Amino acid sequence: YVEPILNKNGKIYVIISDALRYEVGDELTTIIRQEDMFEATIEPVISMLPSYTQLGMASLLPNKNIEFSGDEQATVIVDGINARSTNREKILNNYVSKSKTIKAKELLSMSKDGEDGTRALVKQNNVIYIYHDIIDNAGKLKTEDTVCKAVEDCLVELKQIIRKLTSANATNIIVTADHGFIYQNESIQESDYLGVQATGEKILYNDRRFVIGKKLNEQSSFKKFSSNQLGLKGDIL
């Protein structure tokens, strides 16, 4: 998606909205098409497994290989570099010079003109990744009932970001996500959880929906994948 535009000497602006599932993206497409001088298309894309923020964000960076580290946070490593926060810009610049990462709130607070304005930002960079997080924050513990409102707020803010970029002369914009979400309006009951625990040589990371570890045992309650099956490097998983 990005490389063909860069190969034509174009610039590209990628908005990554955490947990923006397909149906919300489809609604955003409709909203954009209603705007004068705007065109929009939508394509489904399957997220990485396990489908969670750290791995999803890493997979959206250009890379030769992705792997889990051996620490208890199962930190995601892209081409030998920890893929968290500010390192993402370093990874981008290893592939495309004049690349920038920025949070959506920071972008929205910028003026249009001046050395620190959005026009200068667009002019000075070939690739900009904008990180946006409304839906995923609402979906965290004790805030599940706010997800519907968060989706509405997300669409409003994404439209604002797109307008902010286009007013600064940006033309090629991609809106994507690290993963989607499963909606529920109440907390999961204890009886709904599995009654068995994952076992193996070493459990590194134990989430509500998945387990990351080394030489995990086969169990009927779990679906087991190797790193190789998921397109990852290493022997963790």
Q: PLM features: residue spans?
A:
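Feature captures the catalytic ectodomains and active-site-proximal regions of enzymes
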Residues: 1-237
